């Protein structure tokens, strides 16, 4: 049995806390080494690297598709080397949009929003991973009780018999069991291509009825691409948060009465440092988005995202079921779900 690390075991290295180092060669064997801002987990056999510049690294990869990337665990200070094979570049779709949202957060954090522009997500097959010899710190104990926490949230959702009880119970579960103080649920009006807030917690005002367009900010991007979007570095009005308010201000005019909800204040934090948005999907249809944020950097890791995705799946199925029930006593305002 191989002792080589897997992508899953080194996922803390792929959280974007520390830039990676990428080595490539041109056809005559001349090496090139460069820093790269993003190495993103795609699946158990693939990673995505950010393509931002038409530089020597890009030229080499197009001529010689093999590369090695050195990543660092930000907690243990242990290095790992990934041996990669370039497969393709994506300039749209879930992986690209998720990386673009993350990069916007990094850009704002570093004050380089104009420089950090994502041109594509380069998809690489991971041929092997090696642990680099050297001293490091002991690995922390794994987070315990996550599966039990998910069970408690699941049981709470399963007991709900009405939509309002369901939504409030889900948000209460985030607060009580996950320590997530600021969250909201938004539902989709497919005919208007808008998401509107139906429940929230942790804000000065509920913001119920406030709207976000598909593709707008972290929430709108998660909905449009039907993929989780998570940003861990955001400071002083990062692109993906204040763009929402600015856009709402631009549209909330007397000449735009049809834009229902744009006069209702959006309830988000004024300066979030971490955000995660997860689509609510049921039977392949988009119903809405579960969103959480925090004033702390790095508040939501990949384990939090995994748990929220699992919770969102059950929440969406429950919303679907209760809306279809003839006994529903508190239906949400007319929701038109997007087809698969």
Give the role of each language-model region.
Residues 32-35, 193-201, 210, 231-232, ...:
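Amphipathic coiled-coil signal-relay and dimerization helices
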Residues 56-102:
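Short, structured beta-strand-loop surface elements
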Residues 134-163, 321-338:
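Signal-transmission linkers at sensory-effector interfaces
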Residues 149, 153, 162-181, 185, ...:
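Amphipathic alpha-helical coiled-coil segments that mediate homodimerization
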Residues 205-268:
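Regulatory sensory and allosteric helical modules in signal-transduction proteins
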Residues 255, 263-265, 273-281:
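A short, aliphatic-rich beta-strand micro-motif
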Residues 270, 287, 293-311, 318-327:
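Regulatory loop-to-helix N-cap segments in sensory/regulatory domains
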Residues 280-290:
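Short hydrophobic/glycine-rich mini-motifs in sensory/regulatory modules
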């Amino acid at each position: 049995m191989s002792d080589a690390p897997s992508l899953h075991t080194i996922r803390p290295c792929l959280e974007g806390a520390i830039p990676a180092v990428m080595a490539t060669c041109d056809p005559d064997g001349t090496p090139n080494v460069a820093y790269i801002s993003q190495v993103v987990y795609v699946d158990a056999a693939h990673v995505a690297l950010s393509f931002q510049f038409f530089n020597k690294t890009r030229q080499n990869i197009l001529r010689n598709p093999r590369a090695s990337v050195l990543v660092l665990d930000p907690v243990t200070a242990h290095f790992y080397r990934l041996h990669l094979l370039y497969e393709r570049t994506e300039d749209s779709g879930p992986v690209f949009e998720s990386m673009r949202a993350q990069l916007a957060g990094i850009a704002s954090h570093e004050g380089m929003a104009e420089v950090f522009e994502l041109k594509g997500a380069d998809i690489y097959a991971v041929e092997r991973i090696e642990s680099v010899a050297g001293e490091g710190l002991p690995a922390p104990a794994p987070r315990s009780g996550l599966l039990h926490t998910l069970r408690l949230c699941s049981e709470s959702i399963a007991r709900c018999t009405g939509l309002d009880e369901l939504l409030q119970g889900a948000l209460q579960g985030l607060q009580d069991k996950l320590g997530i103080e600021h969250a909201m649920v938004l539902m989709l009006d497919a005919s208007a291509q808008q998401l509107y807030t139906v429940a929230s917690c942790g804000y000065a005002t509920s913001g119920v009825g406030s709207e976000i367009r598909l593709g707008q900010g972290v929430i709108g991007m998660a909905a449009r691409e039907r993929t989780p979007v998570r940003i861990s570095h955001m400071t002083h009005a990062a692109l993906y948060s204040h763009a929402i308010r600015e856009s709402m201000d631009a549209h909330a005019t007397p000449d735009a009465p049809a834009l229902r909800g744009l006069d209702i204040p959006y309830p988000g934090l004024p300066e979030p440092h971490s955000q995660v948005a997860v689509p609510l999907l049921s039977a392949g249809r988009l119903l809405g988005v579960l969103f959480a944020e925090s004033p702390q950097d790095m508040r939501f890791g990949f384990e939090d995202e995994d748990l929220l995705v699992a919770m969102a799946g059950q929440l969406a199925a429950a919303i679907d079921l209760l809306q279809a029930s003839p006994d529903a006593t508190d239906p949400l305002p007319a929701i038109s779900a997007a087809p698969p």
